[in-house]
Amino acid sequence: MMNYNTPKVSIVVPSLNSISYIRECIDSILNQTLKDIEILCIDANSTDGTLEVLKNYEKKDKRLRVIISDKKSYGYQMNLGIKEAKGEYLGIVESDDYIKTNMYERLYEIAKKNDCEVVKGDFYIFAYGKTEYVNVLRNSCEDIYNYKVNWNKDIRIFLGSDGINPIGIYRLDLLRTNQIKLNETPGASYQDNGLWFQIFALAKSIYFINEAFYMLRRDNPNSSVKSKEKVYCACEEYDFIRDFLKKHPDLEKTLAPICALHRFGNYMFTLERIDERYKLDFLKRFSQDFRKILKDKELDENLFGDGDMKIIYSIVENPENYYFLYMGYCNDMFGKLYFGASERIKWQLSYRIGKLLIDLKNPVQILKFPFKLFLEIKQFKFEQKIYKTTIKFYPNLQLPPLEEYSDYEQALKIKKHLSYILGKSFINNPILF
């Protein structure tokens, strides 16, 4: 039976011009096997028909309410939804995603059975007809599944779990008692980071289950993660998180380095995402922020890999030098690697060294070879560090197997080129050369 005063789960759906996806999203919520829910659609005055669609749903199902936001801010919309929610737990569904029919029944069942403030599950990423299962916990943390934890018991929840909020439910008392709110910056950019960090910092009981319910879209061309114009959003969000820690001195000493770690991951992602004309200015902000973090002794090098630390020190020391030496070819590198098997083969050290060997056509070039070889190997190692850092924080960006590329057969032919064969032989037996 539906309890209209206190439903089991209040589901907030912030929306703005989501007409292509909104019906699939709302239908998946209304069809939940858990019927005792309320749906709060917080629309920021959509102009593409989304608002009209939501109002039609509101007429047909009294569990759904449409609330108009006077600000186009994801954080403001979410805060409005949290304020209006009457439920025991909070759920979130983004307006371009959808969920499996048993999601909230299962999460609520686990939450009640284990008396948990937070329950999160695995999820799916889908794009262009392909779907991938993603674990909320990384391999090194899989032993945390099906146990009540918090960061005091196991700091790995901050290091090895996915920060996506809609894949879970959250006891509303936790948010209200601790006055947890999202940053109300304009648009939709990174505000979910602050919500995740606050919840994980303050929750006493978090539970992860090895089941997936949430369908996360990655082919929406209007998604904020694809915007090349939003430059400083990550900076503003991690300043917001750092201000939160200042208000909680009992958390600050331990969690400030965690904040710095995630700031780094998001800054690196921003560097890859934003338009070329903004990169140098962003690197200057990157340098400024991490110089302060280092000065305040808030950076725990044990949380970072050697490559990560070299990147940080390079940017802090000279952001302009980092930009001119590395960023130009790194942008080209990522574009080529993700869209061609042939480029993947040409990126390999065997091919690159082989090409240097083939170009040795006169005594001057032979004399220059050791220096060129040193630079090529140095560049290759740095590119590998950039790639490893990216997939460390965004595992879904890991390169697919070569055979999945459309030019796979052409790539195999490149392996038979003299340049590749020579380079491979050089790597295996450099003394012979």
What do the PLM-derived regions correspond to, one by one?
Residues 43-52, 94:
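A conserved acidic beta->alpha catalytic loop
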Residues 90:
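Short aromatic/hydrophobic "clamp" motif used to bind/position activated sugar donors
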Residues 116, 276-344, 412-414, 421, ...:
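Membrane-interface aromatic/basic loop that binds lipid-linked glycans or pyrophosphate carriers
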